[in-house]
């Protein structure tokens, strides 16, 4: 089969995508496919228009890749691709809107305040919540632009930093606990969750360095959480995946609170990292699936969409 891999891109997650793309291309070649690699840039739209392939594997992360725009273009060109479609991609990228769907699906979310750059006035802003809080851009991944603020001064600095990345930002309650993630796999109506992965960062936070630098985080499979919480996050992950209209695969992140209360969903990743240190491949290993087998499974499921 002739498969094009889109990777790289122009988002803040470009370096991650370059690594994901390399892994995806090597796996596809190992599985016997003819592979065309495209380090994608918006100026290369003509390359997609003229593309003659059986399938596109999207290895992009962040904006202009994970937000539904590339998926929309491929739909217009009638080119099949791996993974979630336009609507599910766009919703998952928009954290504030996605949380509305999660709540409707009965999944616990963090309390939040949403700010917009066009109405925000630093001099008039008055936060009445409890510290610490998490400040983050609405449409960035890999913890880019994220700050944990414990004082008003840190909050104002965090707001300024988040606004550098997005016109809409979230201020969420900070929940102390164990961060876990659940890989979801399957066509619509046939989804299943893979083993829960516990994330143990070497840094204080599971930040960009912890996520992508070798040795900066430990992934424990299965996660060291209670059977009750394991069942909760596995079921909630599938419900969240379905609520947003995701397809084929996604990865859903949670915090399991130290106080024993229900886990809190953080986000759904429709194009999770596929680097050597990524979480989804580790979850797949938990069910005996090699990296190459996982990539081929994505291809097989996408051809049945």
Curated annotation (Swiss-Prot):
The keyword Ligase applies. Residues 99-300 form the ATP-grasp domain. Pathway: Cell wall biogenesis; peptidoglycan biosynthesis. GO terms for biological process: cell wall organization; peptidoglycan biosynthetic process; regulation of cell shape. Keywords: ATP-binding, Cell shape, Cell wall biogenesis/degradation, Cytoplasm, Ligase, Nucleotide-binding, Peptidoglycan synthesis. One of its GO terms (molecular function) is ATP binding. PROSITE patterns: ATP_GRASP, DALA_DALA_LIGASE_1, DALA_DALA_LIGASE_2. The keyword Nucleotide-binding applies. GO terms for cellular component: cytoplasm. It catalyses: 2 D-alanine + ATP = D-alanyl-D-alanine + ADP + phosphate + H(+). Disulfide bonds: none annotated. InterPro entries: ATP-grasp, ATP_grasp_subdomain_1, D-Ala_lig_Van_CS, D_ala_D_ala, Dala_Dala_lig_C, Dala_Dala_lig_N, PreATP-grasp_dom_sf. ATP binds at residues 126-181. It is found in: Cytoplasm. Its EC number is 6.3.2.4. Cell wall formation. This is D-alanine--D-alanine ligase. It comes from Halalkalibacterium halodurans (strain ATCC BAA-125 / DSM 18197 / FERM 7344 / JCM 9153 / C-125) (Bacillus halodurans).
């Amino acid at each position: 089969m002739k498969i094009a891999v889109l990777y790289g891109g122009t988002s803040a997650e470009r370096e991650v995508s370059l690594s994901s793309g390399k892994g995806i291309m090597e796996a596809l070649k190992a599985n016997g496919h003819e592979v065309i690699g495209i380090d994608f840039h918006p100026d290369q739209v003509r390359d997609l228009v003229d593309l003659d392939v059986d399938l596109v594997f999207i290895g992009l992360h962040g904006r202009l890749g994970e937000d539904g725009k590339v998926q929309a273009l491929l739909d217009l060109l009638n080119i099949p691709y791996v993974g979630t479609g336009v609507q599910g991609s766009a919703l998952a990228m928009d954290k504030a809107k996605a949380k509305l769907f999660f709540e409707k699906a009965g999944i616990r979310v963090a309390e939040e305040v949403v700010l917009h750059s066009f109405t925000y006035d630093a001099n008039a802003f008055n936060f009445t919540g409890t510290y610490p809080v998490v400040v983050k851009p609405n449409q960035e991944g890999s913890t880019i632009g994220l700050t944990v603020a414990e004082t008003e001064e840190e909050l104002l600095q965090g707001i300024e930093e988040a606004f550098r990345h997005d016109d809409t930002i979230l201020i969420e309650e900070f929940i102390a606990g164990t961060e876990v993630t659940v890989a979801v796999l399957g066509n619509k109506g046939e989804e299943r969750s893979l083993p829960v992965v516990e994330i143990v960062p070497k840094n204080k936070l599971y930040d960009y360095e912890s996520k992508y630098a070798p040795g900066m985080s430990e992934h424990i499979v299965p996660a060291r959480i209670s059977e009750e919480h394991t069942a909760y996050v596995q079921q909630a992950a599938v419900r969240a995946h379905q609520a947003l209209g995701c397809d084929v695969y996604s990865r859903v992140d949670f915090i399991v609170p130290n106080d024993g209360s229900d886990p809190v969903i953080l986000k759904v990743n429709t194009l999770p990292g596929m680097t050597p240190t990524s979480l989804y491949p580790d979850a797949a290993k938990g069910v005996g699936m090699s990296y190459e087998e996982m990539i081929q499974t994505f291809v097989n499921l996408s051809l049945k969409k």
